[in-house]
């Protein structure tokens, strides 16, 4: 691998950028980015992946091109958090998400899911997982974190997140804590706006920073920034990613973090809309971010590289700091390449372990006095199709629906797919249809945000029919339901979850999960 002393200015700058592309094969525009601008790192999404063998071949091709053009192996990164944020297709083993794992009540499960994920990624050629989420989801109205967090207390997030870190590292994959210094207490998605968390340093130390400190102590080699304003820490109107006070002053100097600092995508609206991606990339580099992500648009990545080159040549970007950052990247890549991975077992063992944890995560937030209602002879399964509730999720629809999958399992009753935000006319029609059924099984997907789903739930509950309500993402949908409604947290809208849920619905299994939240008004009974 090329040393710092052997690198040109452009090669050094290229080590500090990660870029992405559309499609299953890298287009010429993306390959030019590597050849002309020496971009040395890659991010992959679901849009780039067909199956495991294709991903392995793609990673090998990309690694070869980057090594030939830059003399340094790339970090190939991916957001494989589990649950609602997974990039691997169903053909591979996908783990439950953070809050689901915490609902099992066993931190060892977080370690095993990290180890399993690392094994899956390494087998495909990916060496850097952009996980775990260390945000504390203390705001039920948070539109982007929710079930991606391990819970709403710093202690639980620290404990489970640190175990995930240890599992990923033992499995031979780099990982990053995100989103520093915290994205949990906001009602704005930084993909779409510019959130603000108005907390002092002491307040952050008491809550938001505790999981990050624990993750660093567990050995996390990287920390990802967040595009959020923290006005009591950074008085200038710039988000954490672009703030030297936060990146260098807080993370490096006060917390003593010596690993690599990476940015969230600089094409998110919190940066692109308010500051511009190109200017934001340079500001992040100057703030102390080692690896900056331009994940969607190769042309923007090229423009950002040109701008950074000009800044380095005119003295705006400090060359000594550039060298320190690049050396840190080179050492991180050498460390990653030298990892000696452990494994959890063969693919069948990994799949069985993920299914075991997923089944253990299903949580009864409330059960009627008589327990789970019986489905009867003619159950009604209903709910919306999944949709892209945040840009952090995959762009493609799953192609299956909760009602249809449950109807397939039951082999009886009716499946009814509703709108994601049903209006009064649709609600009235659904309630009318429900009257002929023995039991209502409604799956919601962020109904606490799209209120039509909750209006539908309450209208169906008012019929007095036996009813099971399943939250298929954030469990806040389950608040304030009548006592005769069984309320289950399923945590994700995936086929493996539906398979695990079916024995609970048909009465052959009990929901054993424990609610990892204090912010729900109904306690698990």
Regions flagged by a language model, labelled:
Residues 1-37, 275-525:
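Preference for extracellular/luminal or secreted protein segments
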Residues 8, 20, 26-28, 47-70, ...:
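Second-shell residues forming the walls of enzyme active-site clefts
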Residues 92-105, 149-151:
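A charged helix-plus-loop insertion that forms the helical arch/lid used to bind
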Residues 134-144:
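Short, conserved phosphate-binding/catalytic loop or strand-edge motifs used
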Residues 105-126, 208, 217, 280-286:
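Alpha-helical scaffold segments that flank or form the walls of functional sites
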Residues 32-45, 115-128:
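Catalytic domains of carbohydrate-active enzymes, especially glycoside hydrolases
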Residues 40, 127, 221-222, 290, ...:
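Short acidic/polar active-site loop segments enriched in Thr and Asp
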């Amino acid at each position: 691998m090329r040393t710092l002393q052997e690198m040109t200015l452009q090669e050094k700058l290229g080590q500090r950028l990660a870029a992405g592309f559309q499609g299953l094969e890298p287009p010429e525009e993306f390959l030019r980015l590597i050849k002309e601008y020496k971009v040395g790192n890659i991010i992959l999404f679901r849009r780039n992946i067909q199956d495991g063998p294709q991903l392995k071949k793609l990673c090998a091709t990309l690694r070869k091109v980057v090594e030939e053009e830059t003399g340094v192996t790339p970090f190939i990164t991916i957001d494989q958090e589990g649950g609602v944020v997974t990039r691997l297709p169903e053909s591979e083993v996908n783990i439950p998400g953070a809050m689901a794992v915490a609902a099992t009540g066993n931190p060892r499960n977080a370690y095993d899911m990290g180890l399993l994920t690392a094994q899956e990624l390494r087998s495909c050629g990916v060496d850097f997982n952009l996980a775990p989420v260390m945000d504390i989801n203390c705001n039920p109205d948070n539109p982007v974190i929710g079930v991606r967090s391990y819970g709403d207390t710093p202690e639980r997030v620290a404990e489970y997140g640190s175990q995930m870190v240890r599992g990923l590292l033992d499995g031979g994959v780099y990982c990053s804590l995100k989103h520093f210094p915290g994205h949990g207490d906001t009602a704005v998605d930084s993909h779409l706006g510019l959130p603000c968390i108005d907390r002092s340093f002491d307040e952050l130390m008491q809550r938001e920073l505790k999981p990050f400190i624990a993750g660093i102590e567990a050995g996390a080699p990287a920390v990802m920034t967040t595009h959020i304003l923290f006005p009591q820490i950074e008085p200038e109107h710039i988000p954490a990613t672009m703030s030297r006070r936060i990146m260098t002053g807080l993370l490096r100097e006060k917390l003593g973090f010596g690993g690599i600092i990476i940015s969230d995508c600089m094409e998110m609206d919190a940066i692109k809309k308010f500051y511009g991606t190109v200017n934001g990339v340079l500001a992040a580099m100057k703030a102390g971010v080692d690896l900056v992500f331009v994940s969607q648009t190769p042309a923007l990545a090229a423009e950002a590289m040109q701008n950074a080159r000009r800044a380095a040549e005119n003295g705006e970007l400090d060359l000594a700091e550039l060298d320190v950052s690049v050396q840190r990247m080179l050492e991180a890549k050498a460390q990653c390449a030298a990892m000696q991975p452990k494994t959890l077992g063969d693919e069948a063992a990994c799949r069985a372990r993920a299914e075991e944890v997923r089944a253990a995560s299903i949580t009864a937030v409330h059960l009627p006095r008589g327990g789970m209602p019986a489905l009867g002879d003619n159950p009604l399964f209903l709910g919306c199709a999944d949709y892209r509730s945040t840009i952090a999720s995959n762009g493609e629809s799953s192609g299956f629906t909760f009602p249809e999958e449950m109807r397939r399992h039951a082999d009886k009753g009716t499946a009814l797919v509703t709108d994601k935000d049903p209006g009064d006319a649709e609600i009235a029609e659904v309630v009318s249809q429900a009257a002929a059924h023995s039991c209502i099984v409604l799956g919601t997907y962020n109904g606490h945000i799209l209120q039509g789903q909750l209006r539908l739930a309450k209208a169906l509950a008012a019929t007095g029919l036996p009813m099971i309500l399943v939250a298929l993402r954030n469990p806040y949908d389950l608040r304030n339901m009548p006592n005769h409604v069984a309320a289950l947290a399923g945590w994700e809208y995936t086929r493996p979850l539906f398979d695990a849920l079916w024995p609970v619905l048909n009465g052959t299994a009990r929901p054993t999960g424990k609610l990892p939240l204090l912010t729900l008004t109904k306690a698990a009974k």
